[in-house]
Amino acid sequence: MKSNFIEKNNTEKSIWCSPQEIMAADGMPGSVAGVHYRANVQGWTKQKKEGVKGGKAVEYDVMSMPTKEREQVIAHLGLSTPDTGAQANEKQDSSELINKLTTTLINMIEELEPDEARKALKLLSKGGLLALMPLVFNEQKLYSFIGFSQQSIQTLMMLDALPEEKRKEILSKYGIHEQESVVVPSQEPQEVKKAV
């Protein structure tokens, strides 16, 4: 039978807790026997507790627990491990970045004309942030939101990657001619009178 007891000199990165401390954490068993049972089932590392007469008291290494239990006990103890400290820093960096993005977007939205704001809202509601900020997200996903099939998107990407002359040659075979500049009507549209 495998023993979970370890030597004292291997405990540098360990956090040792009594079963009573462990059972006080959220989501942990409500009795000492329950803590011992879970520790045996999950294979937590244990050691004899120092200074206890009779030598039957044990304490468990929190770092040997599965992630869920470990996080619950560490939170209960109010401790921070190197892992949780790094995660906290990463969350803080992410939170600061999101706050900065939010502020920037709000400032930009405040500068929009009412018509531009309506268009942006329509794009946002139809395609999400991807439609509003296509350069941030995958270009192929943007085209699929607009309604292009995957095959059309791939064809478009392939044609776009070709040299201009080759692209014109291929498109001309299908009667499609690229326009060099903006097309402007040669005359103003005539008003149409409705027949009564």
Curated annotation (Swiss-Prot):
PROSITE patterns: HTH_MU (PS51702)
Highest taxon, organism lineage: Viruses
Domain HTH Mu-type: 13-81
Keyword annotations: DNA-binding, Early protein, Host cytoplasm, Host-virus interaction, Latency-replication decision, Repressor, Transcription, Transcription regulation, Viral latency, Viral latency initiation and maintenance
Annotated GO MF terms: DNA binding
Post-translational modification (record): C-terminally truncated forms act as exceptionally stable repressors that prevent prophage induction.
Coiled coil: none
Mutagenesis / variant outcome for changing V183S: Resistant to ClpX-ClpP degradation
Family: Belongs to the mulikevirus repressor c protein family.
Note on domains (UniProt): The winged HTH N-terminal domain cooperatively binds to three operators O1, O2, and O3 with respectively 3, 4 and 2 binding sites. The C-terminal domain (CTD) regulates DNA binding by the N-terminal domain and degradation by ClpX-ClpP protease.
Name of the protein this chain belongs to: Repressor protein c
Species per Swiss-Prot/TrEMBL record: Escherichia phage Mu
